[in-house]
Amino acid sequence: MRCPFCHNDDTQVLDTRVSDEGDTIRRRRRCAKCDKRFTTYERVELVLPAIVKKNGSRVEYSHDKLASSLKLALRKRPVSSDSVDESIARIEEKLLSLGEKEIPSERVGELVMRELKRLDKVAYIRFASVYRSFADIESFESALKELK
């Protein structure tokens, strides 16, 4: 670790502690050249995968887009905002746990549908009708049969 005072690369770790939450490591360091002390913090950087769209283009994952899609499907439905937030967190945790740099948009859509099916059946059908491009009443009937 480079010293922030003299920019020397030779530093010693004097003390290491894990935060109460267990997600951060605090290290107290001393520079071998100027003898000044400083503190560093280490955290895991969690990066959600890029989304590969149906046309092959790649876009950065957007928490806001996921949230707006869920909220649109759940509009005027009796589902609390806390439940929506928990569903978003579950979807994002699943995306992170896959450990992939890229993921097809279809996979994200399936995760959303799984959460909506759990939250509200009407919202599930709303989302599925757009996501799966329902063209006729038979498509709706087929999706309704899946729910039974």
Swiss-Prot record:
Protein species of origin: Polynucleobacter asymbioticus (strain DSM 18221 / CIP 109841 / QLW-P1DMWA-1) (Polynucleobacter necessarius subsp. asymbioticus)
Single GO molecular function: zinc ion binding
Protein purpose: Negatively regulates transcription of bacterial ribonucleotide reductase nrd genes and operons by binding to NrdR-boxes.
Gene name as annotated: nrdR
High-level lineage: Bacteria, Pseudomonadati, Pseudomonadota, Betaproteobacteria, Burkholderiales
Keywords, in A-Z order: ATP-binding, DNA-binding, Metal-binding, Nucleotide-binding, Repressor, Transcription, Transcription regulation, Zinc, Zinc-finger
Zinc fingers, unnamed class: 3-34
Protein name (database record): Transcriptional repressor NrdR
Biological process annotations from GO: negative regulation of DNA-templated transcription
This protein's record includes keyword Magnesium: no
Cofactor: Zn(2+)
Matching InterPro entries: ATP-cone_dom, NrdR-like_N, RNR_NrdR-like
